[in-house]
C-alpha cells in the first residue's frame, strides 16, 4: 500500500475513532456515572448558545463527510493541494496529540465535563491540564482540525480551521460569563492566572470577567 492509499484509508477511520473516543464513549460514561446528559448546547436559554450548538454539529458532520469523500474520491477530486509527505505526517502527529489532549482533559474534568453550558452547577476544575490552559479540550480539538488540514490541505480545510476558531471563541466567551457567575472570585482569580488556549496567553483582568 502506497502512502496516498494509506492516507485515504486512515482519515475516515481516524474521524470515526475521534467521534467514538472523544464524544460517544465519554457521553455514555458520564450518563452512567451521574445520570446527567453531556450534550447541553441546546438547553441554554440564550438563543445564541443554540445557534453555536447547531453550527458545531454541522462542523463535525462536515469534517466527517470530508473524510469519507477523501477516501472515496481521492485528493484531486476535492481540490487537495500537493504537499510534501513530511507535512502530512506532521498532520497525523498533530491529530494524535490533539486526541490525547482531549481525552486526558475529559478524564481530569470528571463529572464536570459537558458539551455546552449546563444550568446545573458543576465543580471548577483548575488542576492537571487546566492549570496550564483554561480550555485544553478546545485546544486539543484545534490540534486535530489543523492536523486534518495538514493531511488534506485545501481551501475547504483551512476555511474549516478558521470556522472552528470563530465558533470556539464565541462559545468560550459564553462559558466564561457563566463560570464567573457560578464560581465568582474563584473563577476570576483562575482566569487572571491561566491562559485561555495557550500558556500565559489570554489571561483575563478581573474587569474582563463579568459576574
Features from the language model and the residues they span:
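A short amphipathic helical element positioned immediately N-terminal to and/or at the very start
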Residues: 125-133
Amino acid at each position: 500500500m502506497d502512502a496516498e492509499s494509506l492516507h485515504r484509508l486512515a482519515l475516515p477511520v481516524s474521524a470515526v475513532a475521534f467521534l467514538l473516543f472523544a464524544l460517544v464513549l465519554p457521553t455514555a460514561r458520564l450518563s452512567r456515572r451521574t445520570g446527567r446528559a453531556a450534550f447541553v448546547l441546546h438547553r441554554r436559554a440564550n438563543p445564541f448558545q443554540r445557534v453555536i450548538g447547531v453550527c458545531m454539529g454541522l462542523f463535525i458532520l462536515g469534517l466527517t463527510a470530508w473524510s469519507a469523500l477523501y477516501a472515496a474520491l481521492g485528493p484531486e477530486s476535492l481540490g487537495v493541494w500537493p504537499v510534501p509527505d513530511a507535512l502530512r505526517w506532521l498532520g497525523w502527529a498533530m491529530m494524535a496529540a490533539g486526541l490525547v489532549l482531549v481525552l486526558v482533559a475529559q478524564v481530569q474534568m470528571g463529572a464536570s465535563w459537558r458539551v455546552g453550558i449546563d444550568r446545573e452547577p458543576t465543580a471548577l476544575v483548575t488542576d492537571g491540564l487546566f492549570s496550564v490552559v483554561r480550555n485544553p479540550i478546545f485546544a486539543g480539538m484545534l490540534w486535530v482540525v489543523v492536523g486534518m488540514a495538514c493531511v488534506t490541505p485545501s481551501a475547504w480545510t483551512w476555511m474549516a480551521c478558521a470556522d472552528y476558531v470563530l465558533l470556539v471563541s464565541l462559545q468560550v466567551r459564553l462559558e466564561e460569563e457563566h463560570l464567573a457567575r457560578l464560581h465568582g472570585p474563584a473563577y476570576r482569580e483562575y482566569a487572571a492566572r491561566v491562559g485561555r488556549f495557550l500558556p500565559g496567553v489570554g489571561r483575563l483582568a478581573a474587569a474582563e470577567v463579568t459576574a
